[in-house]
Amino acid sequence: MPASSVRLPLRLLTLAGLLALAGAAALARGAPQGGPPSPQGGPAPTAAPARGPTLFVLVGDGSARFVFQLGGLGALNDTRIRGHLLGRYLVSYQVVPPPVSAWYFVQRPRERPRLSGPPSGAELVAFDAPGVRRTYTTAAVWPAEVAVLADAEARCPAAVFNVTLGEAFLGLRVALRSFLPLEVIISAERMRMIAPPALGADLEPPGPPAGRFHVYTLGFLSDGAMHQTMRDVAAYVHESDDYLAQLSAAHAAALAAVVQPGPYYFYRAAVRLGVAAFVFSEAARRDRRASAPALLRVESDARLLSRLLMRAAGCPAGFAGLFDGRAERVPVAPADQLRAAWTFGEDPAPRLDLARATVAEAYRRSVRGKPFDQQALFFAVALLLRAGGPGDARETLLRTTAMCTAERAAAAAELTRAALSPTAAWNEPFSLLDVLSPCAVSLRRDLGGDATLANLGAAARLALAPAGAPGAAAATDGGAEEEEEDPVARAAPEIPAEALLALPLRGGASFVFTRRRPDCGPAYTLGGVDIANPLVLALVSNDSAACDYTDRMPESQHLPATDNPSVCVYCDCVFVRYSSAGTILETVLIESKDMEEQLMAGANSTIPSFNPTLHGGDVKALMLFPNGTVVDLLSFTSTRLAPVSPAYVVASVVGAAITVGILYALFKMLCSFSSEGYSRLINARS
């Protein structure tokens, strides 16, 4: 017989005995059974003063919870009832050891600046509170009746993460197999703790002094770190009443949890996410309206961050939805269509053209050193890798790899360091996607620390799956959902694990840079490179029958410049710069005639990667052709000037004409003066 079927009768017997003991104790005192507490957790109604408060006991082993009414708190003095309360299948109510005064804060934290303004414009949506009220139960605090605005839960055998949003109420619970449980309650009303008689029947749960809200943190004092965590997270709601500032802090904490897995950042990121949703819902509830882009942002971030946090707990689960379908009914602005498609798992086919255009525009701006929307790029890459064809996926990875420069990797590393700082104040909007895009969704692995890159890459691959797709929602108690295949590995399966950088081609092969020769494929050893950091360029493919073990040297050539304005000879080629130290500086996919002309312009090029005057003498260039040819590029046979605009030509012609006119006028003046002067001299002599 299964163990679960044995536990059920035992549980029923335990409950029956518990209720019998409670009834016997009540009869012995001659007191009638008490009624439930008020919804605010205050004293019992004055209509029955003799009854006293009622004890609610939560029964269960984690998979289910039941609430039973017992007699008054006086029943706790009965040693038999106390034994049942502390039994295996019931929860202990004594979760906060004395002295309770050690849990309270001395001062409130400093409030941070606002990052977002009040909702305005035509994109407003109604945000009315529902009429449904529900009892919020917990193991340590008297039940409270809450008008629920949103409820989300991610669950698997390894962890449970629950967020309940109500009118001026937040209940957040994290129960993990690997970490100690933590619960945070934010309420406009004072709540009462279920406590032993020695601590008093009207004891407030631990938390900081009441500000705009009462904040309570419940957990186990395992060590000083857990104590400090509970004190820190209790201060979050009073730091800022701006949801965007709270979301930025949640993204920073989630980034830290991804880079350095463990309970320290996990707790902080989970509570930040809940507080951000609470601050947003409170503002929307007060205004009875919300900005559609803001609602979509909170919904998508909740699904993204919950998935990353649950994965850190060993669970392939995430919130299936936060605001119970509200966000799915809002109007979506053109700039948010890719985010909405990712968030709700919509059919990506109508959005593929927009995704391709987004990647192409981001690449064009990146090549010219201009900023681009990294978050929109991430959602576009996610759609193309999941729903685009093999050509879409490989070309997308080729572009994101080219966009991942050393400068962007350094900027992402700086954001990561700031996220790991507990004192960082996010005065500007920040998103984890600003770090993951484009480098973490590329095939470049030579920038940054190995552990950091591996963790960011794993987070990016997890985040690429649409939030509304099967397997991205919460798993059941019967077992976790199977993990989806890595979309990056699926798009380019031929790339070896030791590759520093890979450039996928359309035919199923890829150029890869490594420190040692791969097992298969023609390999080019790049000369003039530090022997401590050798660079090997190989052409690899999945076709083992055509495996070539030839070792070659790239041929140094002066490539011919093209004069045909309608034919792009070097389109689909990849331009690579590397240094003698064995560092790959940049890669550029030549995708248009304009880019080809900039490449051949040499020192006159306006694209920094192509301009040789911006690089030192130890920097060399390669040209990689789609057919697998590798050329050590010296120069082009003729230098072509970068194309100039018609306005510049017209201005030059007009300027030249004016200059000629001025010179002619000066010449006439000089000639006239000389002729007149000679005439006077002749007349004087005569």
From Swiss-Prot:
Intravirion compartment residues: 668-686
Subcellular location: Virion membrane; Host cell membrane; Host endosome membrane
Entry keyword annotation includes Membrane: yes
PTM annotation, UniProt: N-glycosylated, O-glycosylated, and sialylated.
Chain segments annotated as transmembrane: 647-667
Residues exposed to the Virion surface side: 25-646
Membrane-topology descriptor: Single-pass type I membrane protein
Key words of the record: Fusion of virus membrane with host cell membrane, Fusion of virus membrane with host membrane, Glycoprotein, Host cell membrane, Host endosome, Host membrane, Membrane, Sialic acid, Signal, Transmembrane, Transmembrane helix, Viral envelope protein, Viral penetration into host cytoplasm, Virion, Virus entry into host cell
Signal sequence, renumbered to the chain: 1-24
InterPro entries in the cross-refs: Herpes_gH (IPR003493), Herpes_glycoH_C (IPR035305), Herpes_glycoH_C_sf (IPR038172)
One Gene Ontology CC term in the entry: host cell plasma membrane
Glycan attachment positions: 77, 162, 542, 604, 627
GO biological-process terms attached to the record: fusion of virus membrane with host plasma membrane; symbiont entry into host cell
Matches recorded under Pfam families: Herpes_glycoH_C (PF17488)
Main subcellular localisation: virion
Region (Interaction with gL) residue spans: 157-217
HAMAP family reported for this sequence: HSV_GH
Known function: The heterodimer glycoprotein H-glycoprotein L is required for the fusion of viral and plasma membranes leading to virus entry into the host cell. Following initial binding to host receptor, membrane fusion is mediated by the fusion machinery composed of gB and the heterodimer gH/gL. May also be involved in the fusion between the virion envelope and the outer nuclear membrane during virion morphogenesis.
Family: Belongs to the herpesviridae glycoprotein H family.
Name of this protein: Envelope glycoprotein H
Record lineage: Viruses, Duplodnaviria, Heunggongvirae, Peploviricota, Herviviricetes
UniProt gene name: gH
